[in-house]
Amino acid sequence: MTDTSNSLQDLGTLTGAPSAQPVKSVEPKIDAQGRAYGTGRRKEAVARVWIKPGSGKIIINGRDQETYFARPVLRMVIAQPLIEAGRATEFDVIATVKGSGLMGQAGAVRHGISRALVAYEPGLRAVLKPFGFMTRDPRVVERKKYGKAKARRSFQFSKR
């Protein structure tokens, strides 16, 4: 610290001051058909999701959302990112999902829709992140251990 400064104007010229880096603006990632892509995962389910401007139609594995996800709670889960972003009727969603059960698949589609929305409109990341839609849920089934009946349950023990 050999440099000393007596005024605030000299503060920026000191050698220890970091230079201001320009903030990079994130460009939308849209393909030739005008679609944005996002991959979502939950448990063992993997969803590949494409969104494009449209009327709000959601198609999963070639079927309408009402036929693929018959339970209303599952349809609510996949619509959450679109509703919170205020884009429920602005985008058509096409998704292919495989693996896991219906709840895991719905979570994977939700994650994929969130990622695709951010790819299409990067400013939505600040809206979706606080709701946890951008975060991959790390909880998966615990593996079975040898010497145990299940992951944690021991075999029945008889004292006598």
Curated annotation (Swiss-Prot):
GO terms for biological process: translation. It comes from the Bacteria. InterPro entries: Ribosomal_Su5_D2-typ_SF, Ribosomal_uS9, Ribosomal_uS9_bac/plastid, Ribsml_uS5_D2-typ_fold_subgr. Keywords: Ribonucleoprotein, Ribosomal protein. GO terms for molecular function: RNA binding; structural constituent of ribosome. Residues 1-37 are annotated as: Disordered. The keyword Transmembrane does not apply. Transmembrane segments: none annotated. GO terms for cellular component: cytosolic small ribosomal subunit. Residues 1-18 have a biased composition (Polar residues). Pfam families: Ribosomal_S9. Belongs to the universal ribosomal protein uS9 family. This is Small ribosomal subunit protein uS9. It comes from Hyphomonas neptunium (strain ATCC 15444).
